[in-house]
Amino acid sequence: MRWDLITAIVAALVVSVLADESGQMAPYRIHTLFSVECQNYFDWQTVGLMHSFLKSGQPGPITRLLSCTDDQKKTYRGMNLAPTFEVPSWSRHPKTGDWYPAINKPVGVLYWLQHSEEAKHVDWVVILDADMIIRGPIIPWELGAERGRPFAAHYGYLVGCDNLLVRLHTKHPELCDKVGGLLAMHIDDLRVLAPLWLSKTEDVRQDTAHWTTNLTGDIYGKGWISEMYGYSFGAAEAGLKHKINDDLMIYPGYVPREGVEPVLMHYGLPFSIGNWSFTKLDHHEDNIVYDCNRLFPEPPYPREVKIMEPDPSKRRGLILSLECMNTLNEGLILRHAENGCPKPKWTKYLSFLKSKTFMELTRPKLLAPGSVHILPDQHEPPPIDEFKGTYPKIHTLFSTECTTYFDWQTVGFMHSFRQSGQPGNITRLLSCTDEALKNYKGHDLAPTHYVPSMSRHPLTGDWYPAINKPAAVVHWLHHTNIDAEYVVILDADMILRGPITPWEFKAARGRPVSTPYDYLIGCDNDLARLHTRNPEACDKVGGVIIMHIEDLRKFAMYWLLKTQEVRADKEHYGKELTGDIYESGWISEMYGYSFGAAELNLRHSINKEIMIYPGYVPEPGADYRVFHYGLEFKVGNWSFDKANWRNTDLINKCWAKFPDPPSPSAVHQTDNDLRQRDLLSIECGQKLNEALFLHHKRRNCPEPGSESTEKISVSRKVGNIETKQTQGSDETKESSGSSESEGRFSTLKLWVIALWLISGVGFLVVMLLVFSTRRGRGTTRGKGYRNKRRTSYSNTGFLDTK
């Protein structure tokens, strides 16, 4: 009796242990998750995964997280393919409208945690992809997973964990692990990680400026692996450091490590055996789950593989590929039977799938104790001089108008931006009248924030398009949600050569960085004393601006107000005060910037090695980040002046471009300064034409030289074009509202006459204002005068700072 009791107790203990280790009792309850959508493509993958789940002996329940729209559910046939938890579809992002189905994975996991009753009774979670075949039980603690230390497979191509990308998206770049595919973690860790996984996926997906292959490892540069980075960056934010393995999950077609038996196959990549091959993307719309007795093309048999491949290691890899394909087909056979399909006819292949040989090949693979190989920490040490803190987010702005003149500049700017590695997002501030917007064709040229045009001032009627820059910045600040810490403000007529970052150029809150505009002599004379309380704080800067967002919020309105103030002060347009050789007030916006910053005592760090004008001799050793082609520049007989292309549509005419600059071999060989100057000028010209070429290619223009393009080339006869444009330059500059040389050909008298012709009433009002102002001031202006002038602009619609 005593022995019977002992035997019963031992048996109970054994059963208890086995139950624990099978994932059925706390604290060893395992739950497996995988995410899919309502598509045939995911249905056949689900059949394969579910069949392998049952064959492998994986402990615990499994749940399919099914993301479907309401319309998809109406016609969906696969509800019975797996235990299912329905989750909202975010394939089309509910806020941004971005089409990115991969985001459904973190959305589904988070929704399951928040709304599933099953999630309340789980200790460990294994997360897989649908395109996987399980070969043996995946037990988290056997893999080495602990609370706070998840287990994951190695994804070596996630290079963003080692470069700029990680510093932009997490405060803990040192914790970023290149992992994915196979994930096993404690439920408590998943609860912390899941919302971060989703939010970081959204962040990376929206950071289109950093989808480039060199930063992400994505060969397509389309941001498709944003969800993978969302996981790694989210885990880093959560403080989770993974135990990483590189041999338990294998891609069919790869050779397994000697002595290692993979427990998971991931058939995300094409694989082949002899003349047979399989690519999952070839079956994107495949109805194979619902077509009775139809299978994927049968692969070779094991004995054929043994004949064709003498190398034992490679042969073992091919056998794994066979197993993957055969398991998929075996699952389809069983699914067809459940669907009520007639019994299939006998074939040699069906006979093999039911054979003892195949059963032995697919017997569950169990991990040997101590066989799990954990990789050492593979983070690359940062360079000694690299910024040690967390990189702040950056947003780049540039201002344009609804004209083809700004459109070709935008094309050049955006092309260079994508190549430069500039961090963060970018926004074009597009100032348009309602009428111009109706006919505008360049909406797709850049991420755009639309701004009401102030080219014609709403109160004074003054024509001054340059005011759109500060007005647009004010509008952007008041009408968008901005999560960037720093803003980089550039001009459209620029070409980026490299990143412009606050950490490299030492910008800080209260200390913006800019480039020198030495011709702003008004900072040193009466002009500054007339327009700012702090003339000693006036910096002669412009072009490139790096500023903290909080500084910009305080400063932007001053920039706009001071621009209006200087523009209205026509008495002081003289070049001896402003440095403007045309004496037209055209650089009022530049002074508006400097005087506005001075009002706040916002002093700049001035860096002369960020920007260069093509045609200028570079400083020795300077690594310029920006070309500013606002002035004419030449190399030999070739020249470029942006003003000559004001009325030429280079964007909507296929293959239109600028005259090609000379070859670099044609530049000065003896004088190194002149050689470097010319090489930079050539680079700028080449970059503009390169941008135009790619633009026309994206627009699907017919091949150059075809009949449809012969008559639209604008750059075949360089001499003729330059001659025609030179002859018409006076008319062009006089008729264009945004011409930078308006003042050269328009005296104050002509302006008054033109205004009178437009509106006699307006003329009388303006003259009354002018005369009343002259009676009320002497040769100098006091603080009261300035305050009065500011008040006169308080109803522009841009002064609401709430």
From Swiss-Prot:
What are its GO cellular component terms?
Answer: endoplasmic reticulum membrane
Q: How does it sit in the membrane?
A: Single-pass type I membrane protein
E.C. designation(s)? 2.4.1.-
Which residues lie in Polar residues bias regions? 792-802
Per UniProt, subcellular location reads as: Endoplasmic reticulum membrane
**Glycans attached where?**
214, 275, 425, 637
Q: Which UniProt keywords apply?
A: Endoplasmic reticulum, Glycoprotein, Glycosyltransferase, Membrane, Signal, Transferase, Transmembrane, Transmembrane helix
From the Swiss-Prot or TrEMBL record, give the protein name: Peptidyl serine alpha-galactosyltransferase
Signal peptide positions are: 1-19
Task: List the biased-composition ranges (Basic residues).
Answer: 777-791
UniProt cross-references to InterPro entries, sorted A to Z: HPAT-like, HPAT/SRGT1-like
Whose protein is this, by species?
A: Arabidopsis thaliana
Single Gene Ontology MF annotation: glycosyltransferase activity
Note the PANTHER family from the entry: PEPTIDYL SERINE ALPHA-GALACTOSYLTRANSFERASE
Q: What does this protein do?
A: Glycosyltransferase involved in the O-galactosylation of several proteins including extensins. Catalyzes the transfer of alpha-galactosyl to Ser residues. Hydroxylation of proline residues adjacent to the serine acceptor is required for activity.
Q: Which residues lie on this side of the membrane: Extracellular?
A: 20-750
TM spans (from-to): 751-771
Q: Which gene encodes it?
A: SERGT1
Pfam hit, one: HPAT
The UniProt disruption phenotype note reads:
Reduced root hair length. Longer roots and larger leaves.
The residues on the Cytoplasmic side of the membrane are: 772-802
